[in-house]
């Protein structure tokens, strides 16, 4: 939408990019994983031949045939994949969707990202979990193990003005939010998010 070539890349164990995007092409993320593990492939060429483009303009990799293949990627292999994606120069923006784990936050992989977006619905339960997470981040930062709080944003999804409440803690900044869209398809929800221009402040 802002004229930037954007890649959506998921390393979630059960992530399926094809739920959000559709595009032509016969290759999947399996081919990228094989190339990473073989260490013999020109990764820029592999990305160009494997990536698909949705009608929205977003680029993505179709999910592989087995979730275990993603789980099998080592931290070093994921790091090399991210570095190769950035070094390829193909994309202006890379959105990396990943499972939340403290192990991931402690990884030096977080040094490769410019912003970390955490999702919350603003409910009492969600806010309590969010607070516990951030308190743990603060402890790890004081121990010198990580330095990520300044990169963190909170994005509210399925937020209710009646029962939801914003999180106000530490250095975490609010990116914006969206209400629950009842009976809407995935594509309709994406269209509504785009209209909110939530992510523009990250592109400054």
Region locations from a protein language model:
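Cytosolic-facing regulatory segments adjacent to core modules
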Residues: 39-55, 62-99
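Phosphate-binding loop that captures ATP/GTP phosphates
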Residues: 2-60
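A short acidic, often aromatic-flanked loop/helix-cap motif at beta-alpha or helix-coil junctions
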Residues: 68, 161-162, 179-189
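Hydrophobic, Leu/Ile/Phe/Ala-enriched alpha-helical segments that form helix-helix packing faces
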Residues: 1-3, 82-89, 137-144, 200-203
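Short loop/turn segments at strand-loop or loop-helix junctions that form parts
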Residues: 11-12, 60-65, 121-122, 178-180
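Conserved catalytic-core segment of NTP-binding enzymes
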Residues: 87-176
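Phosphate/oxyanion-binding active-site loops and adjacent basic polyanion-contact surfaces
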Residues: 74, 126-129, 195
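NTP-binding/hydrolysis catalytic cores, primarily Walker-type P-loop NTPases
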Residues: 182-204
């Amino acid at each position: 939408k802002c004229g930037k070539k954007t890649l959506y890349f998921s390393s979630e164990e059960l992530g399926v990019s094809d739920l959000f995007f559709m595009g032509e092409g016969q290759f999947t993320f399996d081919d990228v994983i094989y190339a990473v593990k073989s260490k013999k492939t020109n990764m820029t060429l592999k990305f160009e031949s494997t990536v698909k483009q949705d009608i929205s303009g977003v680029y993505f990799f179709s999910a592989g045939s087995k979730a275990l293949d993603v789980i099998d990627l080592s931290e070093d292999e994921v790091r090399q994949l991210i570095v190769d994606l950035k070094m390829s120069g193909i994309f202006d923006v890379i959105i990396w969707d990943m499972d939340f784990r403290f192990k991931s936050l402690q990884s030096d992989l977080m040094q490769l990202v410019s912003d970390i977006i955490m999702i919350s619905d603003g409910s009492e339960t969600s806010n309590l979990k969010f607070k516990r997470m951030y308190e743990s981040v603060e402890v790890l930062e004081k121990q010198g193990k990580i330095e990520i709080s300044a990169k963190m944003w909170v994005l509210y999804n399925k937020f209710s003005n009646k029962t939801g409440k914003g999180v106000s803690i530490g250095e975490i900044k609010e990116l914006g939010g969206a209400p629950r869209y009842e009976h809407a398809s995935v594509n309709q929800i994406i269209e509504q998010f785009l209209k909110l221009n939530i992510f523009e402040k990250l592109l400054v």
